[in-house]
Amino acid sequence: VDEKQNRDRVKQDTIVKDFENWAQNKNIKFDGLRHEQFEFLGSKIQGIKALGKVDAGKQLVQLPKKFTISTYVSEKCPFPGWISNSFWDKQPNYIRLALKLLWEKKLGENSAVQAYVDLLPDPENLDTLYYWTDEELDLLRYPVLKNSVLRQRKEWDELHKQLVSSSPGGAEGAPAPEELAWALGCVLSRAFAGARTGLQ
């Protein structure tokens, strides 16, 4: 294990500990779960481990709504000085969530969910197929999958162009292409849909 890997592991351990302390202080309940490093294909990946048997229907996590990043179809744009209302109104929920995630990242220490945002992987540590080179995709020998990735890249590039052209601050105010791709990747691998009833 080289020095950089050791530094990265110490940094990740600190981020996880800070997140867990923040969650407990905010009355976020996750009894019976803990963060864990798992061996996967010769490397370690971060995940969640259940500390015992999980019965069907058991509630695993409970948190106040103010500590979620969420949206709904009729929601008005929460940051019209940054993203135009016309752009926001046309977007599906997963794109809205990505924009909200970027906004929280932009807020930094002023974000109510900074500890969660810090827990997300850095752009250079995302390893989804979106980030593979064309040569690496060719190694899969699965043209349908490669074409799907290329289509996603094209769609996200087009989305970014639309975002910039409709942004009140233009290119300088809008997220960079790599920032948007990072947020979309995080949302698509973590978000879920649920009923809004009973949220507080």
Where in the sequence are the language-model features?
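Short, compositionally biased
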Residues: T71-W88
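Long, positively charged leader/targeting segments at protein N-termini
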Residues: V1-F67, Y72-E75, K105-Q200
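E2/UBC-UEV (E2-variant) core
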Residues: N85-Q91, I95-W103
